[in-house]
């Protein structure tokens, strides 16, 4: 299929070339950019809706500001694909999220036009403020623009940064991309006119003069003047909250109308002193009918047919882990009315949308606010409820102090279902669930579990529901289960007890999580070479099954721990126990297989696990090396001594 015709876009591969175009050409450029974006993402998959919503804004920003000298920071980065196309990366845009290709987010190592990497939300204003202050300290007149969505404004970090920026009176521009109309819709031409007016030099000069006059009035008249001025501006523009934080507010304006965007951005560029917030209203999926009609379904997409919008989804051999969690929690909630669920703006991603349909009054979406989510759940637990605080592994990092201070130290029975554990593939290192086992298992009294398959996940949901002795977590990966038979309802597992799933005599493989299937496959290969292999499912990283580990250590020559997490997790805890229990004193050969001590770039999970040595081939190779055997499993001959 031929690519769309884009004559203007072909002339503007970089922002300096874009700035050379006359303004009357920019609407056509925006349409060509939108067409190119749709075509590219249809071949790669990725985040489509957000990018379609900021096409005109992206064109306007690069036309008005002198990038890369001026800094544009895209919060989260979902909306940065048009930015990538306009900043010299169009020739690689069809490698998005592919191994060796462009990142799906902004990345400093990828381009000088990406001044700050992102993927987690609500960081742009803080980073932008740091850059703005650095510019002032260096005596430079650099513009710093942070583009943040209204969803990201639900996180406290955004307001912490705005409060600091207002206090510093820093030269910072924040563009609030309101694509859900959750703050205020535009009011047509009058709103655009007022936004243009109040961003201009004349209005601001008059306003400053009026303030100076008011300061000479008696205090009670000063207060009345201030309140009257705030009321008038709030009536027209709705910006009182941002004004109170020290920002000059402009908007709301139509983020798809270049005739409105360009003059406002120029006025702010030319007159700005302290921090300014420009409120633009956009539509997610703008310009592509299927995405406009179903914004949630086109936020993140698989490859799709541009004509029909139909996404290519491979048939599932088993239900997803996320769905198993959601349906299992519903089953437990039917038996226990104290069970409630908490999510931080990810009800669909965590499976709690299903729970919400069944129990709408027992699910709480707190927004992009993981810190609050954890402590909110702690409050529920303190009053006798059973909160399941479902957060992706990578996002739980944002609430770690609350996990320690508000949950663990008080030994409150908050349940943590940890989705997206292990590698997640195309989203890369910012979304990998690598660290939760290590940072949770370090906490005294914290129960840490990992499901090896979907049936085990169902058992762990039941176990967590019944466990009231303190905090408990269970991790599971993105994607479909392995196809095992599912019980109608899970069973309660004995805390701190694993299981043997295959008996052997020479080699022991101790798996924590869904690498169990690779361990079983490796055991078959090892058995074919005469190495009888035991395979065990640890289930628990904390408390460890000491009896099981002792048995494996005493009855086998080689013990290999396998986990889909970083160094410092399950394997480290097992090694600590082996050492303190004296089990290393008899010549046991021990190996710990973990994710490598690097941030792995995006790619396909299977290939990434193979690269890490966490597939069957890597496990077999590790056993052979421990026993000094070659790649075929034959005992290696000693190297002849040479003088």
UniProtKB/Swiss-Prot annotation:
Family annotation (InterPro entries): Dxylulose-5-P_synthase, THDP-binding, Transketo_C/PFOR_II, Transketolase-like_Pyr-bd, Transketolase_BS, Transketolase_C, Transketolase_CS
Superkingdom of source: Bacteria
Binding-site residues, Mg(2+): 150, 179
CDD domains cross-referenced by the UniProt entry: TPP_DXS (cd02007), TPP_PYR_DXS_TK_like (cd07033)
One Gene Ontology MF term: magnesium ion binding
Enzyme Commission identifier(s): 2.2.1.7
Top-rank EC class of the record's enzyme: transferase
Catalytic activity: D-glyceraldehyde 3-phosphate + pyruvate + H(+) = 1-deoxy-D-xylulose 5-phosphate + CO2
Pfam families: DXP_synthase_N, Transket_pyr, Transketolase_C
Pathway(s) the chain acts in: Metabolic intermediate biosynthesis; 1-deoxy-D-xylulose 5-phosphate biosynthesis; 1-deoxy-D-xylulose 5-phosphate from D-glyceraldehyde 3-phosphate and pyruvate: step 1/1
Cofactor remark: Binds 1 Mg(2+) ion per subunit. Binds 1 thiamine pyrophosphate per subunit.
Keyword Chaperone appears in the UniProt entry: no
Cofactor(s) this protein requires: Mg(2+); thiamine diphosphate
Family statement drawn from the similarity comment of this UniProt entry: Belongs to the transketolase family. DXPS subfamily.
Complex and partners: Homodimer.
Record-linked NCBIfam families: dxs (TIGR00204), PRK05444.2-2 (NF003933)
Annotated protein name in UniProt: 1-deoxy-D-xylulose-5-phosphate synthase
Gene name of this polypeptide: dxs
């Amino acid at each position: 299929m031929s690519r769309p015709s884009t004559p203007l876009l072909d002339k503007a591969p970089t922002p300096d070339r874009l700035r050379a175009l006359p303004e009357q050409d920019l609407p056509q450029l925006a349409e060509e950019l939108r067409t190119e974006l749709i075509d590219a993402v249809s071949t790669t998959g990725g985040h489509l809706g957000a990018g379609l919503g900021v096409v005109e804004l992206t064109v306007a920003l690069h036309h008005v500001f002198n990038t890369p000298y001026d800094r544009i920071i895209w919060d989260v980065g979902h909306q940065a694909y048009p930015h990538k196309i306009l900043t010299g990366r169009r020739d690689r845009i069809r490698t998005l999220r592919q191994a060796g290709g462009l990142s799906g987010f902004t990345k400093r190592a990828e381009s000088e036009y990406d001044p700050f990497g992102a993927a987690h939300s609500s960081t742009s204003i803080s980073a932008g403020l740091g850059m703005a202050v650095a510019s002032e300290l260096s005596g430079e007149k650099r513009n710093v623009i942070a583009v943040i969505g209204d969803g990201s404004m639900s996180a406290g970090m955004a307001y912490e940064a705005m409060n600091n920026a207002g206090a510093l009176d820093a030269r910072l521009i924040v563009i609030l991309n309101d694509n859900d109309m959750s703050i205020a819709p535009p009011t047509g031409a009058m709103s655009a006119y007022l936004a243009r007016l109040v961003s201009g030099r004349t209005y601001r000069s008059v306003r400053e003069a009026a303030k100076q006059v008011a300061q000479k009035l008696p205090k009670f008249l000063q207060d009345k003047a201030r309140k009257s001025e705030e009321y008038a501006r709030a009536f027209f523009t709705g910006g009182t909250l941002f004004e109170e934080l020290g920002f000059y507010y402009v908007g709301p304006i139509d983020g798809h109308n270049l005739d409105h965007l360009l003059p406002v951005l120029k006025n702010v560029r030319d007159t700005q002193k302290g921090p300014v917030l420009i409120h633009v209203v956009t539509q997610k999926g703008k310009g592509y009918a299927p995405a406009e009609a179903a914004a949630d379904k086109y936020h993140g997409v698989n490859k799709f047919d541009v004509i029909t919008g139909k996404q290519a989804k491979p048939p599932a051999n088993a239900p997803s882990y996320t769905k198993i969690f959601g349906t299992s929690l519903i089953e437990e909630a039917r038996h226990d009315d104290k069970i409630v669920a908490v999510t931080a703006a990810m009800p669909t991603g965590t499976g709690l949308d299903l729970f919400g349909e069944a129990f709408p009054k027992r699910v709480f979406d707190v927004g992009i606010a993981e810190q609050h989510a954890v402590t909110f759940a702690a409050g529920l637990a303190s009053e006798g409820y059973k909160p399941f605080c479902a957060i992706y592994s990578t996002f739980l990092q944002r609430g770690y102090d609350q996990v320690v201070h508000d949950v663990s130290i008080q030994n409150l029975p908050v349940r943590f279902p940890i989705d997206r554990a292990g590698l997640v593939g195309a989203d890369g290192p910012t979304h990998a669930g690598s660290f939760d086992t290590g940072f949770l298992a370090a906490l005294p009294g914290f129960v840490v579990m990992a499901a090896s398959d979907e049936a085990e996940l169902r058992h762990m949901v039941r176990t967590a529901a019944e466990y009231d002795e303190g905090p408990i977590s269970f991790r599971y990966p993105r994607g479909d289960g392995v196809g095992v038979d599912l019980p109608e309802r899970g069973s309660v597992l004995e805390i701190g007890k694993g299981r043997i799933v295959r008996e052997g005599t020479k080699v022991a493989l101790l798996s924590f999580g869904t690498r169990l299937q690779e361990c079983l496959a490796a055991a078959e290969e090892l058995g074919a070479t005469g190495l009888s292999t035991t395979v065990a499912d640890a289930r628990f990283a904390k408390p460890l099954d000491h009896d099981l580990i002792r048995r494996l250590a005493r009855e086998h020559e080689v013990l290999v721990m396998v986990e889909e997490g970083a160094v410092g997790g399950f394997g480290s805890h097992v090694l600590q126990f082996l050492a303190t229990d004296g089990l290393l004193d008899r010549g046991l050969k021990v190996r710990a297989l973990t994710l490598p001590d690097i941030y792995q770039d995006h790619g396909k999970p299977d290939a990434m696990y193979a690269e890490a040595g966490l597939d069957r081939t890597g496990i077999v190779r590790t056993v052979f090396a421990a026993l000094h055997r070659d790649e075929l499993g034959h005992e290696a001959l000693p190297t002849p001594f040479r003088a």
